[in-house]
Amino acid sequence: MVAAGTDAQFAAVGGGDTDTAATTTGERIMFAPGAAHMDDAALRIVLRHELFHYAARAETAADAPRWLTEGVADFVARPPAPLPANAAETIQRGLPTDADLSGPERSLAYDRAWWFARFVADTYGTAALRDLYVRACGHGHPDLSAAVQQSLGSDLAEVLAAWRQWATG
């Protein structure tokens, strides 16, 4: 683990930006300078999230769906919490894209990814979430639709409709 001294060092070595608390690249978890100002609970969440990426790195393909890798990392890292009032509306946007995860509404994109992982675990079980991760994110993975069908036994459209319903409580 490395704590960057400056934003420039964090960007150069860790590949992060000023809105990111930490990154995992290869053999290193790097914390941004701003992580020093996080409270203990938030820092533990970031550390668990990055440790998941570190532990899963050998089994995660470079072209894995980023939203799923981030959503499962957040599922592992974040404590259970009630869905906010805007969750159902936000989920209507669908699964986040890579651009969403890096864009101005990145926080909501990460939340959508996390909520999808929570939905899968709540509805199908944590073993099914793990299986979906391995199938959809592992080396030589099929497309997402095939991975969802194989892991959850439903087609992607049905799963997304059930996710939207789940978000309404």
Where are these regions (language model features)?
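Acidic/His/Gly-enriched intrinsically disordered linker/tail segments
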Residues: 20-28, 41-46, 54, 58-169
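A mature extracytoplasmic/lumenal domain signature
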Residues: 3-5, 35, 136
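Acidic/histidine-rich, surface-exposed loop or edge segments in extracytoplasmic proteins
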Residues: 31-33
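Auxiliary, metal-adjacent structural segments of Zn-dependent hydrolase domains
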Residues: 1-27
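Walker B catalytic acidic pair
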Residues: 50
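Surface-exposed, flexible loop/turn segments at secondary-structure boundaries
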Residues: 9, 37, 81
